[in-house]
């Protein structure tokens, strides 16, 4: 059952081929036998099995929804009343939220079973999942390599067949990059499509929640469940949500694909370039029109992103002072010492680095030169991408410049870590939807292909990705049967 698609799982549960209790217990067993992946921070086994029993009764009465009785995992930055919400930080190691995030409520309403919460880079800051208070996550394809970040635990849980699907967040590539490294599918929706209420903020103008699964077909099922307006989120967009599962089954009209030359630079591994070119050839054979495009502002994507992201992070994380909530230092005799020591002890090195960077670019004398300038460049990047997408359906390229790197290889080189996001940050800066799907292997390590589309073009993106996956088998590869 672990190799079933979500649609197959849903059908099997509704047909009573096996029970939700059996499926949930199977996932719990898989998690327990793969503890070395370190994909989970917390498990809720007893409650999950109770909910599975309830789901079986609902299914028996023929009242189930598509996700009823299906176990899932949640990145540990979504607030949950039952389980701690740690953000993989000492600062919040014992924090229990008084409410559920909107996305959690939606899954409960749709009958999905939250089996546990996954490991991540601390406060979602990182591209390797090595910046966690609870230890590094390992890649199911090679346990000596990173799964990507910051949603590495969610990606590893799906790739390792521990759960059928999981939820992550994407601020600069934190869904798409781990999806690429772990050989699965992941989508960052348009900014405002999925509620951020109850999702602990890293950079509020960039953060967006989204799903991991094996295929675009599975992603469509999940996205239909979580998309939609939420009055509790001031950035939520009120618009009609299509039935993504139905949309991807419609015939795909002629596809116009934009192919940027800047995505094929020397620092992009040759195996990745070859895999992307092979994908382009397949699309051509399927009738797509390939259009060469020039993204002149691509060299500014990463520096612009890190100025804005760090600035917003320094502001968002200023609330953790050890007084209202968060880690409280025991070695302080004054208020200033309490705040200083609590933050010094509670935050890890990468989070401190980004807070300091953000504080610097927002400080007097540097605000205009860095932050304001970055916001102007952000607008130019957004305009260039929107103009380009007026002439093509999608922009296609590699999700990452390399395959998964070894644990510890880049941990002391933040610049190299930041450059892992070189192809993904633009979608966040512009608020565009983007999806990563598997497209091959290099030295037995997965390669990801990224498709970026217009605002609220998730139906088209998912349809094109599904069209590709109907003609390839990369998304069916399994770490136990390496490609």
From Swiss-Prot:
Broad EC category: ligase
EC annotation from Swiss-Prot or TrEMBL: 6.3.5.7
Keywords in alphabetical order: ATP-binding, Ligase, Nucleotide-binding, Protein biosynthesis
GO BP annotations, alphabetical order: translation
Pfam families from the UniProt entry: Amidase (PF01425)
Transmembrane segments: none
Keyword Cell inner membrane assigned: no
GO cellular component terms listed in the entry, alphabetical order: glutamyl-tRNA(Gln) amidotransferase complex
GO molecular function, one term: ATP binding
Annotated SUPFAM superfamilies: Amidase signature (AS) enzymes (SSF75304)
Active site per UniProt: 75 (charge relay system), 150 (charge relay system), 174 (acyl-ester intermediate)
The reaction(s) this protein catalyses: L-glutamyl-tRNA(Gln) + L-glutamine + ATP + H2O = L-glutaminyl-tRNA(Gln) + L-glutamate + ADP + phosphate + H(+)
Database matches in InterPro entries: Amidase (IPR000120), Amidase_CS (IPR020556), Amidase_dom (IPR023631), AS_sf (IPR036928), GatA (IPR004412)
Subunit structure: Heterotrimer of A, B and C subunits.
Function of the protein: Allows the formation of correctly charged Gln-tRNA(Gln) through the transamidation of misacylated Glu-tRNA(Gln) in organisms which lack glutaminyl-tRNA synthetase. The reaction takes place in the presence of glutamine and ATP through an activated gamma-phospho-Glu-tRNA(Gln).
Cited PANTHER family: GLUTAMYL-TRNA(GLN) AMIDOTRANSFERASE SUBUNIT A, TRANSAMIDASE
Protein family: Belongs to the amidase family. GatA subfamily.
Protein name: Glutamyl-tRNA(Gln) amidotransferase subunit A
Protein's organism: Legionella pneumophila (strain Paris)
Taxonomic lineage: Bacteria, Pseudomonadati, Pseudomonadota, Gammaproteobacteria, Legionellales
